[in-house]
Amino acid sequence: MMRGLLLAGALGLPLAVLAHPTHHAHGLQRRTVDLNSFRLHQAAKYINATESSSDVSSSFSPFTEQSYVETATQLVKNILPDATFRVVKDHYIGSNGVAHVNFRQTAHGLDIDNADFNVNVGKNGKIFSYGHSFYTGKIPDANPLTKRDYTDPVAALRGTNEALQLSITLDQVSTEATEDKESFNFKGVSGTVSDPKAQLVYLVKEDGSLALTWKVETDIDSNWLLTYIDANTGKDVHGVVDYVAEADYQVYAWGINDPTEGPRTVISDPWDSSASAFTWISDGENNYTTTRGNNGIAQSNPTGGSQYLKNYRPDSPDLKFQYPYSLNATPPESYIDASITQLFYTANTYHDLLYTLGFNEEAGNFQYDNNGKGGAGNDYVILNAQDGSGTNNANFATPPDGQPGRMRMYIWTESQPYRDGSFEAGIVIHEYTHGLSNRLTGGPANSRCLNALESGGMGEGWGDFMATAIRLKAGDTHSTDYTMGEWAANKKGGIRAYPFSTSLETNPLTYTSLNELDEVHAIGAVWANVLYELLWNLIDKHGKNDGPKPEFKDGVPTDGKYLAMKLVIDGMALQPCNPNCVQARDAILDADKALTDGANKCEIWKAFAKRGLGEGAEYHASRRVGSDKVPSDAC
């Protein structure tokens, strides 16, 4: 990962680039602090649809918000009767008919911030599956709000600044209380994109003990951090979450991954009105003649700064976004109009596709105006082309629903002339998928549920998988292999260790390969290849739709490619906060059970078993146990 392996949403680099970085911005990458050492630990349980036995068995008719929230709440009470908790206000019914409700454990009125419980309620009103990381140890008897012997929030911010070497200036710092209990905004701070925040919360530490901490939020542009710093010492950092997971349009059309696969063409009104009711160049309030709309706002960002509204973007009163570009053009800024247009097109097209597959307003998608359809608005994606804060990479920041996502696309310097990452669709799709997986896992209001090592690795793998599935060609077969980032990096074989392949000779990676890996992109490459096996098993059964969007019958994609993508997306919403690969496998199986009544159980199990995630595979913090066994009742 670029920046000393610190950006949770970064694309990941070829080894040559890691060894010889060419240009970086001010940020943690230039410091000695390694955020990987502060990742939250992996502790969630997942009870899949086969294992779960509903203690709340009543069916409700009609299926109302009140009924499914009550059903989920009663389950939590039954499972952990002594726990206190609150309902997170991001529950919704997915496009597959399964309702998702999230809970946060509390103690003395304060959140236990990494103690989450997600409940999935089936269409029949019964519990479908659930997962949780609730704390089951002893809650401290003393209420910290009574004695109030913890450090103040300013001390917590200073401690965070010192521990992580953030270079924030605090000479004029002051606090402003918010409506939430022991929650503050900081004023008079420089060196951050927005005012830092602090909230008093508990955190379950890796050793299983409970610590009173200040959760300090600092957006320093290249990293958007939640730091859990001990509220008693004001110095000890117990965990860190990074939200960064670093008309007529003349473009490389959807399905063309990079300039080696086809020419640019002019495409008219490419939006899907069912997914983008305001088109791509309106936000419901204003109509634009530039690369700005409800789903995203694209611009040049040569300085790498955080301001974007006044940055340059092409403007076309007649809506003809047609600008010159050639592979030999130099310098990159000479074709910035084409770069911005391409980035805007790819991101919007992906928004529309994800919408049809279930990533809509209620699920936490990225839109300025949600048009009365639920969820929190005001969160289009900020799309920075030729961002000056780095090279040879890309990243995506995913705050909770209601705050804009931020994508940075860089220039790649491994070729002459240099190459612009915005012209490799797979990179854009990979980055946007960080927003998808972070919003769905643990619920739209919780963006820290892919922060553990294995879950963070799957976050990278989902990006590679979606990018690869989208670039499939009409003549591809089960034996077709694909690479990642090959064009931008100018590296034959791409930026992953092996191509994505169904051949164990071409790609030998299995679940137990993770025992030798401790970096999220390497872990992600294993997960992406498991999903590549799943993709082709479903295509071999159902065929492949080579069109730009799926066709449905009774809510189910009729082909294997889009069905695989749908099941992967639905699985994200079912799985617990910070899942491991075994739990994510179970969530995909459950997604198929919810969508098709398990019609693809055999194909799914065969894909996972081939890569060591068969029946009996186990996750342990120190090692993984593999299995190639397909359950006897699966096929």
Swiss-Prot record:
Keywords: Glycoprotein, Hydrolase, Metal-binding, Metalloprotease, Protease, Secreted, Signal, Virulence, Zinc, Zymogen. Its EC number is 3.4.24.-. Binds 1 zinc ion per subunit. GO terms for molecular function: metalloendopeptidase activity; zinc ion binding. Glycans are attached at residue 287. GO terms for cellular component: extracellular region. Residues 290-311 are annotated as: Disordered. Residues 290-309 have a biased composition (Polar residues). It is an enzyme of class 3 (hydrolase). GO terms for biological process: proteolysis. Secreted metalloproteinase that allows assimilation of proteinaceous substrates. This is Extracellular metalloproteinase mep. It comes from Aspergillus flavus (strain ATCC 200026 / FGSC A1120 / IAM 13836 / NRRL 3357 / JCM 12722 / SRRC 167). The lineage of its organism: Eukaryota, Fungi, Dikarya, Ascomycota, Pezizomycotina. The gene is mep.
